Regions:
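Conserved ATP-driven motor cores of ASCE-family P-loop NTPases powering translocation/secretion/packaging/pilus
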Residues: 60-61, 277-354
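P-loop NTPase catalytic phosphate-binding loop
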Residues: 40-45, 96-220, 241-301, 346-355
């Protein structure tokens, strides 16, 4: 049986071709080293090819397809050089390609209510081999075009967060989140036919202002006792884009200012934002708020255009996106997960009638 190292070396020898001027491992031009967390492409310098982003991406495309489904290569935004041990200057550096063992697998939940009751403390399962620790969560965004499965994914997160956090829910569409909240006896801020949109956003601003006041009180407690553990508070806003368009300028600016302050100050005080929108450009939320998000989910059609706001530096070419409803990309920026973007399959679950 061919070893993984030999298999990968053969794949690169056959596919790189003209990009490296016909040089191969057979002419001792490069080699491969396998590590637990990835593999290293070791060029023997000087060489006739350039070690640049084009070569790095080409190796990624070849290796990612070759290693699937045993490994998932993690896409880098730029060439990843690492130093190698040894005194021979010809082979003292390599191009590193990090990976995760296996592929993304969808979590299937037969009874959502029972499932959420048995969850571990502060744990949010995303896929079979991926969980988020709520204590490491700053703020979260779910993005996707209409019909991509955002509401279905949001209902799952609401059901899980109900067990772990106090919830404030804003539902501009008066749709799925409102029905879920009705079934779970949680109040929702939603539009009413006898009120203007500016009045509706003003009510939201009032609620955000109360949350900011909670943050300030908690900061004072942390000043005296830095180890104090607060209960989580999560502010869930569905269709943020619907709130930021077509409202009075002063009210919109107040909304953005409150979002920014909560995003900036909420982390240490366990006050989180969960924002859902069809897009996250500067007209939806301020860029300064987007920069505070550390769990980013893009569902639906994945290309450079759809990922430009949540993942501005990412070229999704070569990433194996699963087929089906509720699939896309996820990035978790903390000290427990690889910071690179991963293929995502949102959980499939069964819940009470009349919510979805």
């Amino acid at each position: 049986m061919v070893s993984l190292e030999q298999y990968l070396l053969q794949s690169l020898n056959m596919a790189l071709g003209s990009l490296i001027q016909g040089e191969t491992s057979y002419t001792n031009s490069f080699n491969i080293k396998i590590r637990e967390d990835g593999f290293i492409f070791v060029p023997r310098l000087p060489c006739s090819y350039i070690l640049d982003d084009e070569l790095y991406n080409e190796i990624f495309l070849i290796a990612n397809a070759s290693l699937y489904p045993q490994y998932t290569l993690l896409k880098q935004n730029a060439t990843y050089f690492i130093p190698l041990n040894g005194n021979d200057i010809h082979v003292q550096r390599g191009l590193f390609f990090p990976w995760r063992k296996g592929i993304s697998e969808r979590l299937v939940v037969s009874d959502l209510e029972e499932f959420t009751r048995t969850l571990g403390e502060d744990s949010i399962p995303i896929m079979k081999n991926l969980k988020i620790n709520l204590n490491k969560l700053n703020h979260m965004a779910i993005c996707g075009n209409s019909g991509s499965g955002k509401s279905y994914a949001l209902t799952y997160f609401l059901s899980v967060l109900k067990q772990l956090s106090e919830l404030i829910i804003v539902d501009p569409k008066f749709d799925t989140p409102s029905r879920w909240a009705r079934e779970n006896d949680i109040s929702v801020i939603h539009p009413m036919e006898n009120r203007s949109k500016s009045d509706f956003v003003s009510e939201i601003n009032e609620k955000l202002s109360q949350a900011l006041h909670i943050i300030q009180k908690r900061q004072a407690i942390l000043y005296e006792n830095p180890r104090y553990q607060f209960d989580h508070l999560t502010i869930v806003i569905d269709e943020v884009l619907a709130l930021s368009e077509g409202v009075n300028k002063a009210i919109k600016e107040a909304f953005f200012a409150l979002l920014f302050q909560i995003a900036l100050l909420g982390r240490a005080t366990r006050v989180h934002l969960l924002l859902v929108s069809q897009r996250f450009d500067h007209t939806t939320i301020p860029v300064s708020v987007r920069e505070q998000l550390n769990v980013l989910i893009q569902i639906g059609n994945i290309n450079k255009k759809t990922t430009q706001f949540l993942f501005p530096d990412l070229d999704p070419e070569g990433i194996v996106i699963p087929i089906g409803h509720g699939t896309g990309l996820i990035q978790i920026i903390d000290n427990e997960h690889p910071y690179q973007v991963l293929p995502l399959l949102c959980p499939t679950y069964y819940t009470k009638k009349g919510i979805l």
